[in-house]
Every structure is written in structure tokens, then in C-alpha cells.
Swiss-Prot record:
Class of this enzyme: transferase
Binding of phosphoenolpyruvate, residues: 22, 96, 124, 172, 345, 387, 412
Name of the featured protein: 3-phosphoshikimate 1-carboxyvinyltransferase
Main location class: cytoplasm
């Protein structure tokens, strides 16, 4: 197994241009596919998740042209639903942002589609989405365990009408349903059961749908109305914002060991909720400066916080490791959906924090972290989870440094992360 040793870093300073958002990249690729006209996407993320989406779209007959560095994609829309005369089997790796939306989109047309993935994907729930699609007439069959991939879709289109969907596990299910609703045969009324998690991710979806010409009536995130007869129309060009979750590591670095770190590609005009991560750093004592398309973090002594971070679940992971450098006990609350991500992130985070000496209480939907008097060096397991690897790079700011196992797992969203991280040192 490959390992990366990060030696102690005294101070960080510099500027990082954040690669494109995974969430926006895969949403925009699917909407561009369903839209009428050709769309040019710039600052597209070049990563495993996006490659799985692009490979699947190509297999389904979608024509696109990629730039040499894979960050500009010119895609010819189908002007409607995806259909196939022959049965198709699509492998989606561990890409939830491809599996969930494609599962929904493929019910709209005609054909037989089987969706598979890596072993971890078979442990990531999709039942709430499938239940909702079945209410609209979809024929979906699980091939192994009920509620989980792999699955086969026998597509004949979706009817309109009222549909209930659970909102308390993952916002990706609602996102997938929203994106396909305009192409159903009738108007769709979506009723959300339970408290909707990760609402800012729904805001991303609604903003992109509007960019492609579709209007959704949002009744305080409890009910959504999508009137029949709407069509996606290409806006011509779509600029993919930098990934706000990826920005969190560099902002935390600035807060812990700045110096001054500036991230560009996200800022006060961002449609991503994870930019609110900077507000949490500010509450902890960091000096934060906002621009329209940049954020600057400067270091100071950090103090612990006790906060509900349901609205920034991915970026909240970075607070867990930043907490090792804060005075007091930090509590991150309402994060049950960490458990259904690339790994069970609550269990993984607790295990690895204890390795470096932290006192950790792992609850069902919270984590409580008290830093040790002296941080220990350790070998950090990453669980094939890109965010575990990037979060624990913060331990380079301890006096002992840290070893990261399987550092290449960052290829899911940020293949050259450690190279960029190293560029801030000195």
C-alpha cells in the first residue's frame, strides 16, 4: 500500500485555484444531456466521479468533446429523455453523484438499464429514491439487496402526480427526483417526508435547473411543484464553480497555520452551501475575508465550537481535524448522513482521531472531540475515502507530522490535492 509522509509544517501561505465542484459538474452534465442544444461546460472537475458519469453518457449515445486537460466539455444535448434499443449495463464505481441522478433519469425514456458499482456502492442506500420513482410508475428491480444497488430499470417513462420522498437520509434522492420531474408526462408535486438534510445542496440543484430554463416552486423545502410541459434548454455556457468542500482544507490550513491562504473559484456569490464552512472557522477565531469569487483565511488561536453542521456535511469533516488545534471540546451535531457516504465517516473519523491521542465521543449523529495535550504521530487509514485523506492532511501542522495511507484515494475529487497542499508551505 502506498503511503505519504507529511513532515511538520511551520507556516502556510499562498493562493489556490479550487478545481470544479463535483456536485455541480455531474448535475450540469446530466442537465446538458437532457437539454435542447449544445452546452459548453468550463472548469469541469477532472476526477473519478466525473469520469464515471462521462463514460456512462457516452455508452448511452451522448456526444461530447473534452479538452486535453478534461476541464472543458462541449456536449450535444438529446433534447429530451435517454432511450436505448439494446440493454445497457453501466458501471458507476462509488460515484453517488452519478448513481442517484442517472437512476432517476433513465426511468424517463425507453429501454433496459442495469446500474452497478464498486462493493461500497452496494452498501450505499438508494431505496428512498426508488420508492419515489415507483410512485410515478417506474419499474426498478434490485439485483441483490432491497434498497441498494445494483439494480435494473425497465424504462417506459414517468407519469405525473403526487409523490412522497424521504428527506432525512440524503438530499441526493430529492435532487435526482427534482431533475427528472420536468420530463414526466404530467405535473409533479413532491412532498418531503421528515426534516430535509443538506438543504444547500437542493439550492444548487434548483439554481442549475433554472439556468437550463426550468422553474420549480419551492414551498419551504417541504413541497416542490414542477409544472408539466417544461423543457431543459441549454444556456450555451456553464461555468462550474470551484468545489467549496475542497476549499475547506486550504481555509482550515490558513486558520491553523497562517500566514494567509486565499482560495479562488468560490466566494460570497457561490451557490454552494459549503462556503459557510468559512463562517464556522470565523466562529472558532480565524480571520476571514470574503470576495465575490474568493475567500481568505488568516491564522489565530482557535477555540472550540458546538454547532449543528447538517447544512455543510462534507466540509464539517474538516472541522473535526481542525478541532485538534482548538482550545476546548468541539461538538459537530446532526451529521448522521456521514454514515452513508464513501465510508461510515463517523466511525472512521472517531477511530483515526483516537490514533493521534484525541478523546472522542462518537454518537449516532454527532462527534465530540477533545484535543490531546500533545498530538501523536500515526498512520492514518483513509477507507478509500477522498475526504478522510484530505482532512487528515491538517495533522501536518502538529509537531510530529503524520503518515497518510493510500493518499491516491483523493482522485475521486482532487487528484493533485497533496501537490497543491505542499505548494502552500514555506
Amino acid at each position: 500500500m502506498k503511503q505519504l509522509r507529511l513532515e511538520p509544517v511551520v507556516q502556510v501561505r499562498g493562493e489556490i485555484n479550487i478545481p470544479g465542484s463535483k456536485s455541480i459538474s455531474n448535475r450540469a452534465l446530466l442537465l446538458a444531456t437532457l437539454a435542447q442544444g449544445t452546452t459548453t461546460l468550463t472548469n469541469l472537475l477532472d476526477s473519478d466521479d466525473i469520469r464515471h458519469m462521462l463514460a456512462s453518457l457516452k455508452q448511452l449515445g451522448v456526444n461530447y468533446r473534452l479538452s486535453q486537460n478534461n476541464t472543458v466539455c462541449e456536449l450535444d444535448g438529446l433534447g429530451g429523455v435517454i432511450s436505448s434499443e439494446s440493454a445497457q449495463e453501466l458501471f458507476l464505481g462509488n460515484a453517488g453523484t452519478a448513481m442517484r441522478p442517472l437512476c432517476a433519469a433513465l426511468t424517463l425514456g425507453q429501454g433496459e438499464f442495469t446500474l452497478t458499482g464498486e462493493p461500497r456502492m452496494e452498501e450505499r442506500p438508494i431505496g428512498d429514491l426508488v420508492d419515489a420513482l415507483r410512485q410515478l410508475g417506474a419499474n426498478v428491480v434490485y439485483l441483490k439487496n432491497d434498497g441498494f444497488p445494483p439494480l435494473t430499470i425497465n424504462a417506459t417513462g414517468l407519469s405525473g402526480g403526487d409523490v412522497e420522498i424521504a428527506g432525512d437520509l440524503s438530499s441526493q434522492f430529492l435532487t435526482a427526483l427534482l431533475m427528472v420531474a420536468p420530463l414526466a408526462k404530467g405535473s409533479v408535486n413532491i412532498h418531503v417526508k421528515g426534516e430535509l438534510v443538506s438543504k444547500p445542496y437542493i439550492d444548487i440543484t434548483l439554481a442549475l435547473m433554472a439556468q437550463f430554463g426550468v422553474t420549480v416552486i419551492n414551498h419551504d423545502y417541504a413541497r416542490f411543484e414542477i409544472v408539466a410541459g417544461q423543457r431543459y434548454v441549454s444556456p450555451g455556457k456553464v461555468l462550474v464553480e470551484g468545489d467549496a468542500s475542497s476549499a475547506s482544507y486550504f481555509l482550515a490550513a490558513g486558520a491553523i497555520k497562517g500566514g494567509e491562504v486565499k482560495v479562488t473559484g468560490v466566494g460570497r456569490l457561490s451557490i454552494q452551501g459549503d462556503v459557510k464552512f468559512a463562517d464556522v472557522l470565523e466562529k472558532m477565531g480565524a480571520d476571514i475575508e470574503w470576495g465575490d469569487d474568493y475567500i481568505i483565511a488568516r491564522g489565530s488561536q482557535l477555540t472550540a465550537v458546538d454547532l449543528d453542521m447538517n447544512h455543510i456535511p462534507d466540509a464539517a469533516m474538516t472541522i473535526a481535524t481542525a478541532a485538534l488545534f482548538a482550545k476546548g471540546t468541539t461538538v459537530i451535531r446532526n451529521i448522521y448522513n456521514w454514515r452513508i457516504k464513501e465510508t461510515d465517516r463517523l466511525a472512521a473519523m472517531a477511530t483515526e482521531l483516537r490514533k493521534v491521542g484525541a478523546e472522542v465521543e462518537e454518537g449516532n449523529d454527532y462527534i465530540k472531540i477533545t484535543p490531546p495535550a500533545v498530538i501523536n504521530t500515526a498512520e492514518i487509514d483513509t477507507y478509500n475515502d477522498h475526504r478522510m485523506a484530505m482532512c487528515f492532511s491538517m495533522l501536518a501542522f502538529a509537531d510530529c507530522g503524520i503518515t497518510i495511507n493510500d493518499p491516491d484515494c483523493t482522485s475521486k475529487t482532487f487528484p493533485d490535492y497533496f501537490k497543491q497542499f505542499a505548494s502552500l508551505q514555506g
